[in-house]
Amino acid sequence: LGATQTTDALAAHAREQIGRLARAVDTAWPSILVAHAALSDAVLSGTERTASLGRDPALSTRAFARSEFDYVALGHIHRYQNLNTEGAPPVVYAGSIERVDFGEENEPKGFVLVQIDDARSPRATSIRFVTTPARRFVTIEARIPVGGDSTAIIVDAIDRHDIKDAIVRAFYQGDAEDVAPPDTPSLRSALKDAAHVALIARRAATPAKVRRAPITEEMNLAQAV
């Protein structure tokens, strides 16, 4: 089998297994389905967007949101999310408890507290995301004006951030093509409280958009071009 046929076969097998487990549920007791899978409608973070592309079986929330289950606990995707907010059961990625790259810089990390009310019929499941401390990732941006002291400006930008024990990257962008490169040892010294300095780099200037002249019906081909 080729790669596509293999992932399709794995997805079909997974759906069959979910159905088999659902049929085997004793509804007299609360039931939780646990799976490590990448659902096609999940929101990915950072490097997950490229690492998972085309490699995981295409499974949808619908395949897991079976009424036989009171809760579906998923692992694999790093971002906390409930993929079945409008129905039951909750289909939830608790997410990772640590950040792994800058794509997760602003994402809260923690765990999910689940309560299944067995006194109600049908059972009611409530969830609560509890945040926990996680390694911080910090991105620093500095803009160097024409004639500006690049080192001093970047150091000033660093000083405005809490970098203690954080994973840090610093970018600078100059208003002039010939902006002087900063003094790297000085920047490293300013970043000494960081747990790790991942990158110090200049951002490429964004090309300015050039507005095209309007073309009118009165123009001939040579004028329009």
Each predicted region: which residue ranges?
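His/Asp/Glu-rich metal-coordinating catalytic cores
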Residues: L1-V92
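Active-site glycine- and acidic-residue-rich loops that bind
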Residues: D8-R15, D101-E105, E177-P181
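Generic recognition of flexible, low-complexity loop/linker segments
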Residues: L21, D101, D156-D159
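Cofactor-binding loop segments of dinucleotide-utilizing enzymes, especially the Rossmann-like FAD-
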Residues: H36, S96, D175
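Gly/Ser/Thr-rich active-site loops/lids in small-molecule metabolic enzymes
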Residues: R55-S60, S96, V100-F102, S189-L199
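A conserved active-site cap/scaffold subdomain adjacent to cofactor or substrate pockets
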Residues: R62, F69-G147
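Accessory, non-catalytic peripheral segments of nucleic-acid enzymes
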Residues: I116-V225
